[in-house]
């Protein structure tokens, strides 16, 4: 008869969790998913995050000229220099995300005679916990705070790459971002009306997803210097060097990708079209289009309809508090003597941006 493991200590339970991960061969558990892609937790955070500390994350940017330069006489010219405060500070506040799961000792005890069942019980709880975290973080990342009273939601890319002028064929018209209630706010603490050089690049495709879209895309690339880095991102796995995730990406809707692929199918390869259609990816100027299901639904205040969100992750990036990147903790349940709880915590900013004019751009059908 199997020995009971009821009444185990916290240390013993943590040992069981670790042993479960290390010793038992996983059996796949069926799980329905809310999304097909989880780029935030699978790619963006692991590869492009920066580790921070302090009360907030800050960077400095020059948004004004000193007015000290100019042509003058050849000799014995009196200096006329003025001291200007040209630096401004962009500030992103940290936000706290937490989720967890509960393990009941009785359930563990019931399955103690069957190693696979005991493993699957623990695994299923953990899978549900991690899926919940991935869902929540994906939605929050590509969204915005509900209102000025919302002090718990992070600010994502649409705090920095914003809607501009209706029918704009392409300019730095992206003004202050919107809360979900339609009111504006100043991402980073600096208003774009006061500092117009913080405005991001925006173009309105007016729903015309044809060759004219490529014209808008090409112009946006040139105006923002959005291009594939000369030095590729490489990573070594078990001594094998491979290309890592690219720091410049287009995120877009299914409708945009369908039309882009249609243009690619109809192109004359002998001419050497800029639009690629091979190797399982659709690319433009060597930059990949990534599907994001969230963009299949229009947003009045964030991005309009059928957006192309171009992001340079070396300029705009998530910041995570050091030692709090999905940090796990296990403890006894305070109100159930037969249970343990496991939590994962993430302290992060959402996105911080060093310079909105160089972070990418937004092309969409304006609301």
Predicted regions and their residues:
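Short, conserved beta-strand edge motifs with alternating hydrophobic and charged residues
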Residues: 249-253
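Short, glycine/acidic-rich hinge or "gate" loops at secondary-structure transitions
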Residues: 138-160
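Glycine- and acidic
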Residues: 110-116, 366
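Assembly/oligomerization interface modules of large self-assembling protein complexes
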Residues: 33-105, 160-163, 170-171
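Sequence/fold signature of self-assembling virion shell proteins
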Residues: 2-19, 24-38, 42, 154-233, ...
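Internal, well-ordered alpha/beta segment that forms a basic, Gly-enriched binding/recognition surface
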Residues: 101, 105, 113, 119-137, ...
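Short, internal active-site loops enriched in acidic
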Residues: 149, 254-258
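A generic secondary-structure signal for well-formed alpha-helical elements
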Residues: 133-144, 206, 221-224
């Amino acid at each position: 008869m199997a020995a009971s493991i009821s009444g185990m200590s916290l240390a013993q339970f943590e040992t069981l969790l670790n042993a479960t991960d290390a010793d038992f061969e996983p059996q796949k558990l069926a799980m329905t998913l809310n999304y097909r892609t989880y780029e935030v937790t699978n790619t963006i955070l692991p590869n492009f995050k920066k580790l921070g500390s302090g009360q907030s994350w800050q960077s400095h940017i020059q948004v004004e000229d000193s007015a000290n330069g100019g042509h003058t006489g050849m000799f014995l010219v009196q200096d006329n220099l003025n001291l200007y405060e040209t630096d401004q500070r962009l500030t992103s506040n940290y936000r706290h995300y937490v989720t967890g799961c509960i393990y009941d000792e009785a359930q563990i005890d019931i399955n103690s005679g069957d190693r696979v069942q005991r493993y699957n019980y623990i695994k299923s709880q953990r899978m549900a916990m991690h899926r919940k975290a991935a869902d929540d973080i994906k939605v929050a990342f590509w969204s915005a705070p509900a209102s000025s009273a919302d002090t718990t939601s992070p600010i994502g890319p649409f705090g920095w790459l914003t809607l501009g002028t209706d029918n704009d064929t392409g300019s730095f018209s992206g003004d202050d971002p919107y809360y979900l209630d339609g009111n504006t706010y100043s991402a980073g603490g600096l208003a774009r009306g006061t500092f117009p050089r913080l405005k991001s690049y925006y173009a309105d495709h007016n729903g015309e997803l044809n060759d004219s879209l490529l014209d808008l895309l090409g112009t946006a690339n040139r105006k923002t210097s959005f291009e594939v880095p000369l030095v590729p991102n490489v990573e070594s796995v078990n001594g094998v060097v491979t290309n890592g995730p690219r720091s410049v990406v287009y995120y877009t809707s299914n409708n945009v990708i369908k039309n882009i692929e249609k243009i690619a199918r109809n192109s004359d390869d002998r001419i050497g079209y800029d639009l690629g259609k091979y190797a399982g990816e659709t690319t433009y100027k060597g930059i990949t289009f990534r599907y994001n299901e969230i963009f299949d639904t229009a947003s009045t205040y964030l991005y309009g309809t059928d957006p192309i969100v171009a992001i340079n992750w070396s300029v705009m990036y998530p910041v995570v508090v050091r030692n709090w990147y999905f940090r796990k903790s296990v403890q006894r349940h305070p109100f159930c003597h037969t249970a343990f709880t496991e939590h994962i915590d993430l302290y992060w900013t959402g996105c911080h941006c060093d310079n909105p004019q160089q972070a990418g751009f937004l092309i969409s059908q304006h609301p």
